[in-house]
């Protein structure tokens, strides 16, 4: 992901290292070398993705590229696992944000769009649908803030908080990312057929929402 980034973190096995995950080390791969020359790797292709199109994902080929080891040798997999855990947290936060955007759009439309001689937001079934989106968005935001608090306490040396973070992070990622897919679809319906048009944000939010439960 983010194939055109200035730096990338990659796992590689140094010569003579052990087999399996224990022999992997973490390396920093810059796009350009200190003298300004491009590093020796090529982006072979960019992937035609359903969503998150603003962040290009691609395949690269290393051609004698220069990279710098990060941390202790042969602990790359452990370091990458820590990064993946943080990425799971960010996925949950991202899902919470997507639902908040979907809810904001849905409420705006429900207040301004009329049906049966009155605004949509006055109709009981529409209120029920909006409430479902709101509950999912609020629960995701609440657990996101709680997990962030526990993470700050864990970084300060609280061992009990560290254990809670290990539990909360996958729960947030699983629940929020699943809820975001449903919430994005329900919010699109509030705008009607216009929500299916790329001129509005609903289509992009819906596409992006489906990635969270797949990543990490």
Question: Where are the regions a protein language model picked out?
Answer:
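Flexible loop/turn segments at secondary-structure boundaries
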Residues: 1, 17-19, 34-37, 68-69, ...
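Short Gly/Pro-enriched turn/cap motifs at secondary-structure boundaries
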Residues: 1, 18, 49-56
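A short core secondary-structure module
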Residues: 1-40
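Composition- and surface-driven signal marking solvent-exposed, interaction-prone regions
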Residues: 2-10, 23, 76, 95-96, ...
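Active-site lining segments that contact anionic ligands and/or coordinate catalytic metals
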Residues: 4-7, 21-24, 38, 55-59, ...
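Short beta-turn/strand-loop junction motif enriched in small, turn-promoting residues
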Residues: 13-17, 48-49, 67, 211
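A glycine-rich, basic-preceded beta-loop-alpha segment at the flavin cofactor/substrate interface
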Residues: 32-40, 44, 49, 56-87, ...
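Alpha-helical interface subdomain recognition
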Residues: 61, 88-216
């Amino acid at each position: 992901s983010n194939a055109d980034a200035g730096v990338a973190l990659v796992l590689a096995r140094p010569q003579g290292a052990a087999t399996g995950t224990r022999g992997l080390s973490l390396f920093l791969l810059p796009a350009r070398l200190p003298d300004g020359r491009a590093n020796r790797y090529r982006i072979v292709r960019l992937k035609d993705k359903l969503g998150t199109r603003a962040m290009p994902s691609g395949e690269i080929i290393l051609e004698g590229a220069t990279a710098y080891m990060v941390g202790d040798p042969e602990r790359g997999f452990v370091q990458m696992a820590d990064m993946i855990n943080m990425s799971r947290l960010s996925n949950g936060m991202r899902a919470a944000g997507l639902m908040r955007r979907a809810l904001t759009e849905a409420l705006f439309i429900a207040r301004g769009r009329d049906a049966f001689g009155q605004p949509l937001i006055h109709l009981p079934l529409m209120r029920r649908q909006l409430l479902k989106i709101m509950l999912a968005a609020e629960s995701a935001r609440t657990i996101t803030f709680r997990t962030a608090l526990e993470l700050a306490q864990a970084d300060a040396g609280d061992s009990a908080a560290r254990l809670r973070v290990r539990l909360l992070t996958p729960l947030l990622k699983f629940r929020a990312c699943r809820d975001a897919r449903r919430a994005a679809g329900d919010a699109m319906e509030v705008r009607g057929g216009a929500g299916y048009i790329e001129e509005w944000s609903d289509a992009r939010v819906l596409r992006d929402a489906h990635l969270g439960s797949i990543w990490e």
